[in-house]
A protein has these predicted regions:
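N-terminal helical cap/lid subdomain that shapes the substrate entry/recognition surface
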Residues: 1-55, 62-64, 75-77
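N-terminal-biased segments
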Residues: 8-9, 68, 96
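Proline-centered loop/turn at the N-terminus of a beta-strand
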Residues: 67-69, 144
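Short coil/turn segments at beta-strand junctions that form active-site/ligand-binding loops
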Residues: 64-67, 123-124
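Asp-based, Mg2+/Mn2+-dependent phosphohydrolase catalytic module
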Residues: 75-76, 80-174
């Protein structure tokens, strides 16, 4: 199954396969003890929000008048699920997702596309990412970047760029 996943995952994340097509190729090419619907429910249930980070970015948008663009490698169905269930559209201006762009990180074109959509130059942007290689690629394009490892260090780095939360300070979370 891992080989099948590796062969199909990029195509799936680039929006060239539906979830049903992907699951049929990778999981349900043979009889299973669970249904595709059960597997989908399980898969979506694994997706958890990061409420502190969501609230931080929403606050920074209001406080500093920021334009928020999300650049992600994500398949269409999971992307829609997260946007809806985590209420991301309430503060995100554009979603540059691999499933829409048909290109995925680490391809630098997805970052260039995000800059074009946002109508922003690289030095105007702060990119937050938890994958070191993607941070390096963005930095190579002149985008100020933060390697997210935890809320507190990300807040500190944002503050160093002049972006503080509503209280004007970096604060600890419980």
């Amino acid at each position: 199954m891992e080989d099948r996943h590796n062969l199909n995952f990029a195509t799936y994340e680039e929006g060239k396969l539906t979830l049903e097509e992907y699951l049929t190729r990778v999981v349900f090419y043979q009889k299973r003890s669970f249904t595709q619907a059960e597997f989908r429910r399980f898969m979506f249930a694994q997706s958890k929000p990061y409420p502190d980070m969501i609230e931080l970015v929403a606050q920074l948008k209001v406080r500093h008048g920021l334009k928020i663009a999300v650049v992600s490698n994500e398949a269409r169905e999971l992307n829609a699920y997260r946007i809806r269930n985590f209420k991301l559209a309430r503060f995100v201006d554009s979603f540059v997702s691999s499933c829409f762009a048909h290109v995925r990180k680490p391809d630098a074109d997805i970052f260039r596309l995000a800059l074009d959509i946002a109508q922003a130059s690289a030095p105007q942007v702060v990119y937050i990412e938890n994958t070191p290689m993607f941070v390096q690629i963005a930095e190579g394009l002149g985008i100020r970047s933060i390697l997210h490892t935890d809320y507190t260090s990300t807040c500190a780095k944002l503050a160093s760029f002049g972006l503080r939360n509503d209280e004007g300070v970096v604060h600890e979370t419980s």
